[in-house]
């Protein structure tokens, strides 16, 4: 500090010691521990320096008036963000700013200061300060100034941001609870964002509360699912096991595409939209996902599973108006020729399940130019028993073996398949089978007049047997049936009602439309 009777030149250095930074979460990353964050938290002491020059103003001499101008540079490079798009960067990058201050003494012992700062980190800040000093406070001469304390930028040498946790309005405004899975995590953790579980089974066991969210990272589950890979389709590190919700209204979400949850704190938050393809699930002995209790699941590839998506009891959450189970943005397919697979299997269920943007089977071109159908071996959609309501729309089905749709032994409910315009369900297996069904079945296109299903069947195109429900097939094209003894449409012993609108049948060596003992 250099003092004169006309003004001064002053510089400060800021050297914090000890623990100088604490964070809760990270910018651009919604997760911290088991919480979803609306805003990450930060407390950081800043190192740096400032420099100012001050001059007494002649017109304010009676009040010892001084105008000071200065600049500063601060930052905290001791700690880095550990996650999110700024991972590896300083928690407070170095920044510079400028300021100006007016100092005056109105009456003996009372000092007044007014300061304004501007910088790229805090934007505009400042303070107004009134100070009572024992023993007088006139400051025009050097001896008086020596007795005055140094002026410092205390108000901006600590960076602070209060963490805000996302709350769930539907769960009494309790914080959302998230359990994390990443099969590349080392060591094996306890399910926090910083220490994930490495497998689905452990995460499933930990998700015991209503509205719990299990979030699955891609990890290394997509090995050999790059179309350019010479071993394309030979998956080696998928997530195994079955996820079955242990409480109502849970979530099972893969990362790689946007998925928003509602919060009462800060509106919708995306918990799935980190960059990269979706994680891969595979269970050769059972279902990869069981729908129950209003489960919401999204953003997965299910490959070579005995059952892609299954069920476990009531599909809806308990109570009147309980939330249905919902599956969105899921691809189910088979890459292993030896695997026995089914797409969606709903057994003896009640309640409702909604499927949106779920694709079953697909056609791929291998690196050598070979075209393969990665489809199910034992049918695409099977509904057996119970009285569920199944609503499938905005997805695609490519079926080459067994039935594209089988509904059997239902006691009520309804199965609705709605195709998108220009994306009819494609069947070259064993057609549609409805047997002993008291529930209704509807196949249609979202835009009437566009084909909903194109059937090139090895057996009957559509077979309905011993069923008392109402079956409605709109805009179905049957280009072939299985030959002698088979029919494009075969109705046998049905006390219910079968409706066909805009049905187009072309067959060779088989019957077009056959009805026997039918209502």
Spans of features found by a protein language model:
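Flexible, glycine-rich linker and terminal segments associated
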Residues: 17-68, 74-84, 88-90, 105-113, ...
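Surface-exposed intrinsically disordered loops and tails
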Residues: 38, 79-86, 186-188, 223-241, ...
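Right-handed parallel beta-helix/beta-solenoid
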Residues: 163-206, 210, 218-222
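Detector for repetitive beta-architecture
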Residues: 178, 211-213, 220, 242-243, ...
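N-terminal extracellular ligand-recognition/capping segment immediately after the signal peptide
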Residues: 211-265, 284-285, 305
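Feature marks extracellular polysaccharide-active and adherence modules
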Residues: 217, 253-255, 292, 303, ...
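Short glycine/acidic-rich loop motifs that flank beta-strands on beta-rich extracellular proteins
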Residues: 225-227, 263-264, 285-289, 304-311, ...
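Right-handed parallel beta-helix/beta-spiral solenoid domain characteristic of secreted/periplasmic
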Residues: 251-305, 336, 424-425, 445, ...
């Amino acid at each position: 500090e250099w003092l004169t009777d006309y003004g001064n030149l002053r510089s400060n250095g800021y050297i914090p010691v000890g623990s100088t930074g604490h964070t809760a979460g990270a910018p651009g990353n919604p997760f911290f521990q088991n919480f979803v964050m609306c805003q990450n938290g930060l407390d950081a002491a800043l190192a740096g320096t400032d420099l100012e020059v001050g001059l007494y103003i002649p017109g304010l001499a009676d009040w010892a008036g001084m105008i000071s101008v200065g600049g500063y540079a601060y930052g905290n490079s001791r700690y880095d963000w550990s996650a999110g798009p700024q991972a590896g960067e300083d928690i407070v990058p170095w920044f510079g700013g400028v300021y100006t201050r007016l100092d005056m003494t109105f009456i003996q012992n009372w000092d007044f200061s007014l300061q304004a700062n501007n910088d790229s980190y805090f934007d505009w800040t400042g303070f107004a300060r009134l100070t009572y000093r024992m023993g007088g406070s006139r400051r025009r001469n050097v001896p008086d100034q020596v007795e005055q304390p140094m002026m410092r930028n205390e108000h901006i040498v600590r960076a602070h941001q209060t963490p805000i946790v996302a709350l769930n309005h539907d769960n009494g405004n309790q914080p959302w609870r998230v359990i994390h899975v990443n099969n590349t995590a080392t060591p094996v953790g306890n399910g926090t964002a910083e220490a994930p579980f490495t497998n689905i089974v452990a995460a499933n066991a930990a998700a015991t509360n209503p509205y719990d969210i299990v979030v699955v990272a891609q990890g290394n589950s997509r090995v050999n699912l790059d179309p350019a890979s010479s071993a394309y389709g030979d998956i080696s590190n998928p997530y195994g096991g079955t996820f079955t919700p242990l409480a109502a209204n849970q979530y099972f979400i893969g990362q790689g595409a946007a998925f928003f949850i509602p919060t009462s704190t800060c509106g919708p938050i995306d918990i799935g939209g980190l960059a990269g393809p979706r994680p891969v699930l595979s269970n050769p002995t059972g279902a990869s996902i069981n729908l129950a209790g209003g489960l919401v699941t999204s953003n997965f590839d299910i490959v070579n599973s005995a059952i892609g998506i299954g069920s476990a009891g009531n599909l809806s959450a308990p109570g009147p108006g309980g939330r249905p189970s919902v599956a969105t943005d899921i691809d189910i397919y088979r890459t292993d020729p030896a695997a026995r697979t089914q797409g969606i299997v709903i057994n003896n269920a009640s309640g409702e399940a909604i499927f949106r943007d779920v694709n079953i089977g697909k056609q791929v071109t291998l690196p050598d130019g070979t075209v393969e159908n990665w489809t199910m071996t034992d049918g695409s959609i099977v509904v057996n028993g119970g009285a569920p309501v199944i609503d499938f729309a905005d997805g695609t089905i490519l079926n080459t073996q067994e039935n594209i749709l089988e509904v059997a032994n239902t006691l009520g409910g309804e199965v609705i398949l709605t195709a998108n315009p220009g994306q009819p369900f494609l069947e070259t297996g064993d057609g549609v089978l409805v047997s002993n069904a008291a529930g209704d079945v509807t196949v249609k296109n979202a835009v009437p007049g566009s084909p909903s299903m194109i059937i090139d069947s090895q057996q009957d195109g559509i077979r309905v047997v011993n069923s008392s429900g109402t079956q409605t097939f709109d805009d179905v094209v049957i280009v072939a049936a299985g030959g002698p003894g088979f029919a494009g449409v075969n109705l046998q012993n049905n006390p219910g009602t079968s409706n066909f609108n805009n049905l187009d049948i072309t067959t060779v060596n088989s019957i077009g439309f056959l009805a026997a003992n039918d209502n």
